[in-house]
C-alpha cells in the first residue's frame, strides 16, 4: 500500500469526536442492514413505525436517518481546526496544497469505487459524482482553505453567502422550464444542472438504443449545485471545532454554547422551510441549517458527557468505527460479505424461514465487518487520506 493507506497512531484526539463519528458509522454500516432485515421478519405496527427512524424521507422533510450523511460531513469539518492550525502559523503552504489535493483525489476515487461503478470496468456505466465521500472531498477542500486563509468572521460571511447563493439560484434562475422556485423532483434547478453537467455520468443514467441519455425516474439526488451547501455542512463542523479547540472558554461552557447555537440553527432552518423547503436529496440551504443544528447539539452532548464529565463506560467500542470511518464505509459498500455467512449458515434457512435468515445474514455481516475493524484498531492501523 502507498502512504495514503495505513498509518500508525498519532497525537491526542478528541474522544467525543471519535465516539460520535463511531455512532454515525455504526448506524450506517452496522445497524441499517439489520433493521431493514428485521422489518421483513417482524410484524406489527409498532415495529414498522419504529422503522421510520431508519428510512430516508421520500422528498420533503427530515427523518433521523437523514442526519447520517450530514453528520459525516460535519465531523470531517470538526477535525479541520485540530489538523490544519499549523498551516495558519506558517507551516509550508506547498505541503498544505499537496495534502489537500491528495485528500480530494483519494476521497473522489474512493467514492467512485463505492458507488460510481469504477470496479465494473465498464466505461459506459461509470458514474462520476454520486457518493458521500465525494461530497466530503469537495466540502473539506474548500472549508480547509477558508480556515487557513481567512478569519472566522470571513468564514461566517462565506457560509452565509453560499447558503443564500444556493437559495437565490433555486428561486430566481429559470432554464428550460426548471427552477424559478420550483422544488418538485422533476422541476428544480439542481436537477437540470446535474442532468446537463453530468449527463451520462450521472448515477443511474443510461444511453438508450437511439443514443439518448435516459435518467432514472427514481434517482433524485443532486450534486453539482448542492456542492455549495456541502461546503457549508463541512464549515459548520469547522466552526464547532474552532469553539472546541479554543482555550478561552471553560469546557462546560463550550458544550452549552454548542447546544444553544444548535437550537438556533435548527430553529432558523425550520422557519426557512416555509419558503425554502427542507429537502435532503437537494441539500437545500434550510436542510443544512436544520441538520447542522442537530449536529451541533449532538456534539455538545457527546463533548459534555465524554470530554467534560469523562464518562465513557459502554462507549469506547464505538471508537473502533470512529477511528477507521473511511475503512468501515468502504468495507461495507465495496465488498459483499454476505457470501461468507451464507456459505456457513445456509442450512438454517429451512428451520427459521427466509425472513429470519436474512436477519441472521445481515447481523453476521455486521459482526464480521466490526471484527475486521477491531483487528485493525488493535494493531493501530487506520486508513488515512
Name each model-derived stretch.
Residues 1-385:
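Alpha-helical transmembrane segments and their immediate juxtamembrane cytosolic regions
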Amino acid at each position: 500500500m502507498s502512504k495514503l493507506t495505513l498509518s500508525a497512531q498519532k497525537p491526542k484526539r478528541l474522544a467525543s469526536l471519535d465516539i460520535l463519528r463511531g455512532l454515525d458509522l455504526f448506524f450506517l454500516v452496522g445497524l441499517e442492514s439489520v433493521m431493514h432485515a428485521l422489518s421483513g421478519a417482524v410484524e406489527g405496527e409498532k415495529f414498522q413505525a419504529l422503522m421510520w427512524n431508519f428510512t430516508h424521507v421520500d422528498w420533503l422533510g427530515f427523518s433521523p436517518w437523514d442526519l447520517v450523511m450530514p453528520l459525516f460531513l460535519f465531523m470531517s469539518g470538526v477535525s479541520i481546526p485540530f489538523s490544519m492550525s499549523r498551516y495558519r502559523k506558517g507551516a509550508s503552504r506547498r505541503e498544505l496544497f499537496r495534502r489537500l489535493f491528495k485528500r480530494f483525489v483519494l476521497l473522489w476515487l474512493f467514492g467512485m469505487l463505492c458507488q460510481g461503478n469504477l470496479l465494473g470496468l465498464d466505461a459506459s456505466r461509470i458514474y462520476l459524482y454520486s457518493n458521500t465521500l465525494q461530497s466530503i472531498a469537495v466540502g473539506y477542500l474548500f472549508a480547509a482553505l477558508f480556515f487557513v486563509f481567512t478569519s472566522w468572521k470571513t468564514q461566517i460571511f462565506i457560509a452565509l453567502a453560499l447558503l443564500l447563493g444556493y437559495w437565490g439560484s433555486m428561486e430566481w434562475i429559470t432554464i428550460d422550464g426548471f427552477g424559478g422556485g420550483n422544488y418538485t423532483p422533476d422541476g428544480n434547478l439542481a436537477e437540470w444542472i446535474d442532468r446537463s453537467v453530468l449527463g451520462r455520468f450521472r448515477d443511474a443514467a443510461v444511453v438508450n438504443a437511439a443514443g439518448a441519455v435516459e435518467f432514472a425516474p427514481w434517482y433524485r439526488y443532486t450534486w453539482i449545485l448542492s456542492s455549495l451547501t456541502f461546503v457549508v455542512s463541512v464549515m459548520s463542523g469547522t466552526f464547532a471545532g474552532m469553539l472546541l479547540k479554543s482555550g478561552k472558554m471553560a469546557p462546560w461552557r463550550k458544550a452549552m454554547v454548542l447546544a444553544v447555537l444548535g437550537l438556533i440553527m435548527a430553529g432558523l432552518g425550520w422557519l426557512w422551510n416555509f419558503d425554502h423547503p427542507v429537502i435532503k436529496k437537494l441539500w437545500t440551504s434550510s436542510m443544512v441549517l436544520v441538520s447542522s443544528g442537530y449536529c451541533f447539539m449532538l456534539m455538545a452532548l457527546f463533548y459534555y458527557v465524554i470530554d467534560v464529565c469523562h464518562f465513557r463506560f459502554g462507549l469506547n467500542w464505538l471508537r473502533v468505527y470512529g477511528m477507521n470511518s473511511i475503512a468501515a464505509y468502504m468495507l461495507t459498500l465495496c465488498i459483499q460479505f454476505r457470501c461468507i455467512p451464507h456459505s456457513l449458515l445456509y442450512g438454517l434457512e429451512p428451520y427459521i424461514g427466509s425472513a429470519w435468515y436474512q436477519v441472521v445474514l445481515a447481523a453476521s455481516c455486521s459482526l464480521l465487518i466490526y471484527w475486521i475493524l477491531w483487528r485493525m484498531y488493535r494493531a493501530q492501523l487506520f486508513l488515512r487520506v
